[in-house]
Curated annotation (Swiss-Prot):
Catalytic reaction equation(s): guanosine(527) in 16S rRNA + S-adenosyl-L-methionine = N(7)-methylguanosine(527) in 16S rRNA + S-adenosyl-L-homocysteine
Protein location: Cytoplasm
Binding-site positions, S-adenosyl-L-methionine: 85, 90, 155
Organism: Rhodopseudomonas palustris (strain HaA2)
Gene field: rsmG
Entry protein name: Ribosomal RNA small subunit methyltransferase G
Length: 237
């Protein structure tokens, strides 16, 4: 009798998970092949570098890949992306795999952990996806980051008001941000409006649960106010 941990039994839930993800967020055969290569590499590295929560490994396609791919529908013409805190590559590597089909497609992946940055570089090499890895903290001098971006992303990196602060200097006419957030999105938006004038669009995650995508296409910092000492202190920093 086969062990419950055998490749045969492990492959079945993975195949079902993949099929469900591709129903939610269809991709071309070429992109699917790149994503397969990426996930094979992730599983290999996961043993020595914690790239994703171990409990989510059986649902890599739905929990992570589809969650990342859904951003493409919200920015269908975007070709130049920047992903803050790329970690294990969600959404950055997934987006890069999709951008390989488009002329001028490119994803800049910003990651402060050297081991994870090394993984991201290897993932770009193995998949042939167009991208660049920057070993940097997302709070570093923004002059280091590329300009002329179409879309800025982040997933499970920092509170919303901080992410907006990191993205604001990189925004140009026609660009947008897409931040993947969880069940506390309303509280985070309330906090963010203390510091920023924003008109967010909220999109429920296609992958279910309590996930949300915050879409912003304009960010303006509130002027320092003596009636809002907390915002004024934030502005000084």
């Amino acid at each position: 009798m086969a062990s419950r941990h055998s490749p045969q039994t492990a492959a079945q839930p993975d195949a079902a998970d993949k099929a469900q993800a591709l129903r939610l967020t269809p991709v071309s055969r070429e992109t699917e092949t790149r994503l397969d290569a990426y996930l094979d590499l992730l599983r290999l590295w996961q043993a020595k570098t914690n790239l994703v929560a171990p409990s989510t490994l059986p649902q890599l396609w739905t929990r992570h890949v589809a969650d990342s791919l859904q951003l493409l529908a919200l920015a269908p013409t975007a070709r130049r992306w920047l992903d803050f805190g790329s970690g294990g590559g969600f959404p950055g590597i997934v987006l890069a795999c999709a951008m390989a089909e488009h002329d001028g497609g490119h994803v800049t992946l910003v990651e402060r952990n050297a081991k994870k940055a090394a993984f991201l570089r290897e993932a770009l090499r193995v998949t042939g996806a167009p991208g660049t890895v920057m070993l940097a903290d997302i709070g570093d001098n923004v002059d280091r980051f590329p300009r002329a971006l179409d879309c800025i992303t982040a997933r499970a990196v920092a509170p919303l008001h901080q992410l907006i602060g990191f993205a604001a200097p990189l925004m140009t006419e026609g660009s947008k941000v897409l931040f993947l957030k969880g069940q506390d999105v309303e509280a985070e938006l309330t906090e963010a409006t203390k510091y920023w004038k924003i008109e967010p669009q909220l999109h429920a995650s296609l992958t279910g649960g309590q996930g949300w995508i915050v879409e912003l296409d304009r960010i303006v910092r509130h002027a320092p106010s003596t009636t809002n000492p907390e915002a004024a202190a934030h502005d000084r920093h």
